[in-house]
Amino acid sequence: MDTDTSISEDLKLAVLEKIKPTEAERKELMAVQDELAAEVKAAAEKLCVSDIFVKMVGSAARGTWLSGTHDIDVFISFPEETSRKDLEIRGMGIAREVAKHAEYAEDRHAEHPYLNIVYKGFDVDLVPCFRVCSACQLKSAVDRTPFHNEFIKSRIKGREDDVLLMKQFMRGGRVYGSELKTQGFSGYLTELLIIYYGSFEKTVKAASSWKPGKKIDIMQHSELEHSEPLVMVDPTDPKRNVAAALSLDKFCMFIDHCREFLKSPEIKFFFPESPLPIEDKEFLEKLESRKTSQLAIVFETPDVVDDVLYPQLYKMEQAASSLLSEYDFSVIKTGVWSGKPQTVVMLELISGTLPNVKKRTGPPVWVREHAEKFKDKYEGAENVFGGYIENGKYVYEVHRKYTTAKGLLEEQLLNCSLGKQVYQSVNKGFEVIENAEICRLKDQDFRVFLRKWV
């Protein structure tokens, strides 16, 4: 592979033309940020809350936001000695006062509550935090964010375009976003990669040769060993891995994306074509071509945020696969899709049916005690077809309890280890549909997922 392939300035400029905020966008963002800061201060004064600082953080504050994204993070910091209870009561009080001027508001919860609002078309998080003196002495996880902000702002000047290119490139490779649904690269991690390697081009070339266990320590101050595929030691906290949320698959998808791009640098790596929803006819043709069994477990989507939902869905996906394997069904792959109102866990099997007979092999005949116990268990039992000795061991052919994957899932799924909210939803009712029956699911986003699936 030729890693010396140059990435043309024309290509980078063509991408930046689509993703770099215009002067009008920047002015609007700054005006809204100023308004929000004034609203927070006015709310604090109205509620007689003193000694709070307002700080804009995140990509909007650092000049590394993509055109068309309207996210603002407003941190309301309280003195370090403030109790957690006071922080929540007074911080959320200020946030709710600001929300009176918003188009929409929703309480959310990370380590402690914060408020998400839509204000003049911008998606805004109002986050109370403690004003600690060091990112190594946190009282809550969000307290480190202002330190991240200062570190990036002091080093990113002149490289903002490289960050924008990298973010869009990662989006094109479906690896951008550190939320638990995606398990990819966070914005902060992306910025640190650009700071460390120096440019978009250098980062892509370096990443094309990464291996699991890659470690980057900008400040050379790491204090702990980490086991994740990529370790980016937090410059503000030597014990923390910024890339902890990055899964092995997304790490490897990024490596592959970089390699393919370097072979032939094209705009499609930034803006891939969006797949169309698959139609019934094409799906049925794919089924006929694959000659496998497709199963879909369908249930009502739990009313929880994605960071709560998706770990539970991945847990259910694994539990269903393990259950099928335990009963001798061969699982090819699994996947999850979630929308409103339904969630679907997909499973592809070599076959959805098994014969009535199952072979049970016991210990060698000469291991007398165990061999006789095994023989006594099966000899003459009504669910046994017959027995014989093979390779010196007792063998009995018995009736298989579950001969269809669908029947097994219908009877045993609720006995699997499922997350709390997913279990509650599945317990209300679920359906297992297979093969051509899956055409009953008409949601267009699901049909896009289904196209990728087959």
Swiss-Prot record:
Binding of ATP, residues: 59, 62, 148, 167, 176
Keywords for this protein: ATP-binding, Magnesium, Metal-binding, Nucleotide-binding, Nucleotidyltransferase, RNA repair, RNA-binding, Transferase, tRNA processing
EC assignment: 2.7.7.72
Binding annotation for Mg(2+): 71, 73, 125
Recorded GO MF terms: ATP binding; CCA tRNA nucleotidyltransferase activity; magnesium ion binding; tRNA binding
Cofactor(s) this protein requires: Mg(2+)
Catalytic activity line of the entry: a tRNA precursor + 2 CTP + ATP = a tRNA with a 3' CCA end + 3 diphosphate; a tRNA with a 3' CCA end + 2 CTP + ATP = a tRNA with a 3' CCACCA end + 3 diphosphate
Statement: the UniProt record of this protein carries the keyword Transcription regulation: no
InterPro entries tied to this protein: CAA_C (IPR048833), CCA-adding_arc (IPR008229), CCA_tRNA_nucleotrans_2 (IPR042090), NT_2-5OAS_ClassI-CCAase (IPR006116), NT_sf (IPR043519), NuclTrfase_I-like_C (IPR011068), Polymerase_NTP_transf_dom (IPR002934), tRNA_NucTransf2 (IPR015329)
Residues engaged in binding CTP: 59, 62, 148, 167, 176
Pfam families: CAA_C (PF21133), NTP_transf_2 (PF01909), tRNA_NucTransf2 (PF09249)
GO biological process: RNA repair; tRNA 3'-terminal CCA addition
Family to which the UniProt record says this protein belongs: Belongs to the tRNA nucleotidyltransferase/poly(A) polymerase family. Archaeal CCA-adding enzyme subfamily.
Free-text function comment from the UniProt entry: Catalyzes the addition and repair of the essential 3'-terminal CCA sequence in tRNAs without using a nucleic acid template. Adds these three nucleotides in the order of C, C, and A to the tRNA nucleotide-73, using CTP and ATP as substrates and producing inorganic pyrophosphate. tRNA 3'-terminal CCA addition is required both for tRNA processing and repair. Also involved in tRNA surveillance by mediating tandem CCA addition to generate a CCACCA at the 3' terminus of unstable tRNAs. While stable tRNAs receive only 3'-terminal CCA, unstable tRNAs are marked with CCACCA and rapidly degraded.
NCBIfam families xrefs: cca_archaeal
Additional observations: A single active site specifically recognizes both ATP and CTP and is responsible for their addition.
Subunit structure: Homodimer.
Protein name: CCA-adding enzyme
Gene it is expressed from: cca
